[in-house]
Amino acid sequence: MSISIYEFFHYSLFLGLFVAFTYNKKQPPAFGAALAFWCILLSFLGLLFCHISNNLSNYNVLTANALFFYQISGTWSNHEGSILLWCWILNFYGFFFCYRGRPQSHNVLKQGGYRESLFFFFVLNFVKNSILSLLRYEQESGLKNQLYTPFVLRTLVDSELCSRRNRTFDGPALFYAPLYPERKIKNPLDAWRFRGSREGKRTHPLLHLARDDKERASSIDEQRIDGALGIALFFSFFLLASSDPFVRNFFVCTEPLAELNPVLQDPILAIHPPCIYAGDVASAEGFGLCRSKMMNGIVALHSPPMRKDAAEKNGTLLCSAGCVGSRITSELFTLKFKHVGAKCYPALLLRSNRSPLMLLRRRFFAFSSFWAGARSHSTKRY
């Protein structure tokens, strides 16, 4: 009977790998992450029970004889057990992350509210306030707006208005606003129908910053969660392929063949691997989020609607992503100035742009002094 229980713990690893392969993206991400988490948890508890009960049919238990406390720590004191602990912590973070910050399509409660995540609320609110402060700085300094098109400004204002009134439809209409500002959404019912259309799926990248507090707190989509689940899938496959912790003995033995490593028989070193893994594995979640966010941003910026909009308007996101030098040159050589008349002469043009000229001159002198210093250093050396 005990052999069947240990085999069940062993096969739960294969079940977790099967769930990761056959996960349906139409379902909530927390559903797939929960199944994988519980499967890995059963395997880890099964290996822990093997060490506690001193089951000598397991090879790892046969070579790790020690006291009861170190029998427990012997679960992760070898290569196979440490990889299993790594996979379990990774699936735990994925499950906790999906549960606390589920996407909008799966995060609606029966009361009509949304789950909030304090971390994402703080970060996105900080980014939004930074953008608004940059807007005030550009307005006070009189510089030309490079990032804030009328559509983006209207979106930021609408987000504040939407946060003050209750929604009567499923899902925020602001998030599914199209790239084309000339197409307006008349009522919430049209916005709900517009969600599933092909044009509604191409959203503006800056709309993530323009939603209200509850929407921005729960704005984790499936593609970003799949990046973290893919890392867990790799380690689960590696665990089953080369580091199986449930290897059984082909002979009967009544006493352990070896003791646990004396270096690991220390209270601090016994709890050291779980503490280290808890910090190291958490970085995998951040890596998955950043990777998927960068890929989504690249696809959005190079999409045909975005490139067409960038070619027509000088203040789009693509033009604002340039360096400071491109911004200075665009302000120096453009003919669209408020304080210059219809006949724009070069003298008036340079006079109305003295601050960019000063900045350009400072950078030129800094570069020339750096180049002269490098040449003098090379001549002294040779």
UniProtKB/Swiss-Prot annotation:
Forms a complex with CCMFC, CCMFN2 and CCMH that performs the assembly of heme with c-type apocytochromes in mitochondria. Belongs to the CcmF/CycK/Ccl1/NrfE/CcsA family. It comes from Arabidopsis thaliana. One of its GO terms (molecular function) is heme transmembrane transporter activity. This is Cytochrome c biogenesis CcmF N-terminal-like mitochondrial protein 1. A stretch of 270 kb of the mitochondrial genome is duplicated within the centromere of chromosome 2 resulting in the duplication of the gene. The expression of the duplicated gene (At2g07783) is not demonstrated. It is also probably not RNA edited and therefore differs in all the positions known to be edited. Keywords: Cytochrome c-type biogenesis, Membrane, Mitochondrion, Mitochondrion inner membrane, Transmembrane, Transmembrane helix. PANTHER family: CYTOCHROME C ASSEMBLY PROTEIN-RELATED, CYTOCHROME C-TYPE BIOGENESIS PROTEIN CCMF. The chain crosses the membrane at residues 1-21, 30-50, 79-99, 117-137. InterPro entries: Cyt_c_biogenesis (IPR003567), Cyt_c_biogenesis_plant (IPR003569). It is found in: Mitochondrion inner membrane. The gene is CCMFN1. The keyword Mitochondrion applies. GO terms for biological process: cytochrome complex assembly.
